[in-house]
A protein has these predicted regions:
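Metallocofactor- and cofactor-centric catalytic cores in central/energy metabolism, strongly enriched
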Residues: 2, 13-29, 36-40, 44-45, ...
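A charged, amphipathic alpha-helical module
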Residues: 2-33, 141, 145, 149-276
């Protein structure tokens, strides 16, 4: 059971579970505009600095209906869900859309939005995927400047350095508070379920960031003293899912089988909050540096940085959190993850790190089959010699 107070979590959960209702309520109360962002690289600070609400578009857990005719079945669940939401009018609450592409499938989903709602402004930031070539930094800086001008045009607000600097500081504080919760969980000073942690991250992608930070401070202040560590639970690291969150019922199942999630590199997890924006110097240059730094702090298979790779990062993270094994969550038809996984698995096997691959789908996940596989995985780890587990 999580140490987080249910009452404190209720606001976060409402925003994470029903983001469109939150966005509409925010617009009604503030009179402001909401801008939709797509995973995983656009700096929300630019939109926030213009007085609008930046919202990372989440997948909708309801079955895909109208979207089935708009994208092929071999597109991942997130992109098909986005297309379906667009076709059903679920995304009409947004006043504009911004995408810093990293995936051909996501571009297809965004094209559906352009087709369904041609009246809505759509900006392609087109950030480079080669992170340390000679031309990378100036090209990224140019894309950041283009995005700034586009936001200024759509919202009619000049983005001064002062506005941008304030927004950078606001988002950095929120990320630091969320990382504090991660540190508490890794160290065993707090027991936070995987579902609750994902709720905190997802809600930060949706809510007004100042409101989210205020509630986070209260949540941290209200944490109970940690209970005695559960020695009977197996410590696991969750890895994967670059665009959308794993289903809460899947996360709950993982921990019901005798596991305790102590760390992750999920997009709706540590990957989203791993990197702060530098708070000194020119804000636009700082946002460019943030983009480049993200792949050093939490490498992604959609980006290439010389001498930085995901498998080394993952192994280091597992050792730092003292995890006994890793559960890899791969969204079905996620091509970047599928292409990188053999190298990842080879590195884990070379270090004798127990690993379980679970392929997830938008709907129709075989929960009982997953339960059996998880129980077997946990039992296999428990039968290892004690020295091998720590």
């Amino acid at each position: 059971m999580s140490e987080l107070k249910p009452a404190a979590m209720s606001v976060f959960r409402l925003a994470a579970d029903d983001p469109m209702t939150y966005v509409q309520a925010w617009k009604d109360s503030s009179g402001g505009k909401a801008i939709a962002l797509f995973p995983m690289n656009f700096p929300a600070e630019i939109v926030h600095a213009a007085g609008a609400l930046p919202v990372v578009v989440q997948d909708d857990p309801t079955p895909i209906t109208e979207g089935r005719s708009l994208l092929a079945e071999f597109y991942c669940g997130y992109t098909r869900s986005v297309a379906d939401q667009a076709a059903r009018g679920r995304l009409d609450v947004f006043d504009a859309f911004v995408v810093a592409d990293h995936c051909v499938q996501l571009l297809g989903a965004v094209d559906v939005i352009r087709w369904v709602r041609p009246d809505k402004p759509m900006h392609f930031a087109q950030f480079t995927s080669a992170m340390d070539d000679a031309w990378t930094q100036p090209r990224v800086a140019g894309r950041i400047e283009d995005a700034k001008r586009e936001v200024e045009t759509v919202l009619g607000v000049p983005l001064t350095s002062e506005r941008l600097a304030r927004s950078i500081a606001v988002f950095n504080e929120n990320r630091r508070l969320l990382r504090e919760l991660y540190d508490l969980r890794r160290s065993g000073r707090a027991w936070i379920t995987a579902t609750d942690m994902q709720t905190l991250i997802k809600s930060s992608m949706v809510m007004d960031i100042q409101e989210h930070t205020r509630l986070l401070r209260g949540l941290l202040a209200g944490l109970d003293a940690p209970a005695e560590p559960r020695e009977d639970l197996v410590r696991v690291h969750l890895s994967g899912h670059f665009c959308h969150g794993p289903r809460p019922e899947l996360l709950d199942l993982i921990e019901e089988t005798g596991a305790m999630v102590v760390d992750d590199d999920l997009y709706t997890g540590y990957r989203y909050i791993a990197t702060d924006v530098p708070e000194s110097g020119d804000p636009l240059a700082a946002l460019s540096q943030w983009y480049l730094d993200r792949n050093r702090n939490a490498p992604c298979p959609t980006r290439v940085t010389t001498e930085i790779d995901w498998d080394t990062y993952l192994i280091d993270s597992i050792e730092a959190s003292r995890a006994d094994g890793v559960v890899v969550l791969m969204a079905k038809f996620c091509e970047p993850h599928m292409l990188y996984y053999p190298e990842l698995r080879k590195a884990l096997d070379a270090r004798d790190i127990p690993a379980l691959l679970l392929e997830t789908e938008h709907e129709g996940n075989p929960i009982e089959t997953v339960r059996t596989r998880m129980e077997t995985f946990i039992e296999r780890i428990r039968r290892q010699p004690a020295a091998a587990r720590s």
